[in-house]
Amino acid sequence: MSGIIEAKKQLVEQIADQLKNSVSTVIVNYRGLTVAEVTELRKQLREAGVEYKVYKNTMMRRAAEQAGLEGLDEFLTGPTAVATSTEDVVAPAKVIAGFAKEHEALEIKTGVMDGSIISAEEVKTVGSLPSHDGLVSMLLSVLQAPVRNFAYAVKAVGESKEESAE
């Protein structure tokens, strides 16, 4: 019997470490999804570098307590799955929010970002943001635009002076 308890303690520690080390976590209710839909969701999350697991709620409660995430208990009822990412803050929210739009059976319960609990609406909002790379490319294009426009203006002035010289 003590072997089972030890295994459960190790699982709780593993989940707590996962919660502590992740930059973004989304907790969902997957009731009503078919096996094919869950498989598709797992595939999309895997491609985005997100880990998706189903844990017992009691294990999640203990792990959340160990990880210092008070207030998560109220969301840990019914079928619960957890999507975590250690690299991209937006990835779990983006994939799950997009999947939830197509499949109404997937219900976003809550999320955790930077150690604080966020609502389902906030998860959807984060999911609508572009990825880090997308934001960087937007910033670069905004920074390049004035320089590019200046270069075009200088070129136009140079061409007009050449035409007037001829």
Curated annotation (Swiss-Prot):
Keyword Ribosomal protein: yes
Entries under CDD domains matching the protein: Ribosomal_L10
GO biological process, one term: translation
A GO molecular-function descriptor: large ribosomal subunit rRNA binding
SUPFAM superfamilies in alphabetical order: Ribosomal protein L10-like (SSF160369)
Record's keyword terms, sorted: Ribonucleoprotein, Ribosomal protein, RNA-binding, rRNA-binding
GO cellular component, one term: large ribosomal subunit
Keyword check for Cell wall biogenesis/degradation: no
Quaternary structure, from the entry: Part of the ribosomal stalk of the 50S ribosomal subunit. The N-terminus interacts with L11 and the large rRNA to form the base of the stalk. The C-terminus forms an elongated spine to which L12 dimers bind in a sequential fashion forming a multimeric L10(L12)X complex.
Job description of the protein: Forms part of the ribosomal stalk, playing a central role in the interaction of the ribosome with GTP-bound translation factors.
Name recorded for this polypeptide: Large ribosomal subunit protein uL10
Taxonomic classification: Bacteria, Bacillati, Bacillota, Bacilli, Bacillales
